[in-house]
C-alpha cells in the first residue's frame, strides 16, 4: 500500500509514505498522486487527534553519493511538511529532517528493497 502504518513502542506511531508514489526519481516536487497520499495521512492523523510534534523524516536508497541522498531526503521531507502542515490541527508542530541512506528498512541490494528505503516517515508521539 502507498501508506503503511506501524506502531512502535512508547506510544509512537510511524506512517511510512513511499517516495516512489510521492516523487519522480531524483525530484523533490510532489506528484498529484503523492499529494493524495499525504492528504490521506493528514486525515488519519486528524482522526486520531494528533497533538504535539510530528516528525517528517526523508530517506533515500544507497544509489548515488551519500551527500546527494542526504540533501534530497531533506528537501523531500520539507516538501511533504509544506503539504501536510496546513491540514493538521493548530498547535501541532512539524519538525523535518533527512537521513539520506541511513536507517534502511530493507536491503539496498535489490530494487524492491531500495524502493522500500525511498520513503518519508511521519512519526507521532501519543496518538490513540
Q: What does each model-found stretch correspond to?
A:
Residues 2, 7, 23-57, 82-86, ...:
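Periplasmic peptidoglycan-binding/anchoring modules of Gram-negative envelope and division proteins
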Residues 3-4, 9-11, 109-110:
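Short beta-strand/turn micro-motifs at beta-sheet edges
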Residues 59-128:
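Periplasmic OmpA-like peptidoglycan-binding domain that tethers envelope proteins to the cell wall
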Residues 20, 35, 77:
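ATP/adenylate-binding site constellation spanning eukaryotic-like Ser/Thr protein kinases
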Amino acid at each position: 500500500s502507498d501508506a503503511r502504518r506501524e506502531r512502535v513502542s512508547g506510544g509512537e506511531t510511524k506512517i511510512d509514505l513511499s517516495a516512489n508514489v510521492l516523487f519522480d526519481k531524483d525530484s523533490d516536487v510532489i506528484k498529484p498522486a503523492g499529494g493524495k497520499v499525504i492528504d490521506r495521512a493528514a486525515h488519519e492523523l486528524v482522526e486520531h487527534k494528533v497533538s504535539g510534534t510530528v516528525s517528517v523524516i526523508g530517506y533515500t536508497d544507497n544509489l548515488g553519493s551519500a551527500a546527494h541522498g542526504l540533501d534530497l531526503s531533506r528537501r523531500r521531507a520539507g516538501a511533504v511538511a509544506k503539504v501536510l502542515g496546513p491540514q493538521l490541527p493548530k498547535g501541532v508542530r512539524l519538525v523535518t529532517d533527512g537521513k539520506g541512506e541511513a536507517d534502511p528498512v530493507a536491503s539496498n541490494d535489490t530494487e524492491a528493497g531500495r524502493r522500500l528505503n525511498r520513503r518519508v516517515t511521519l512519526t507521532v508521539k501519543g496518538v490513540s
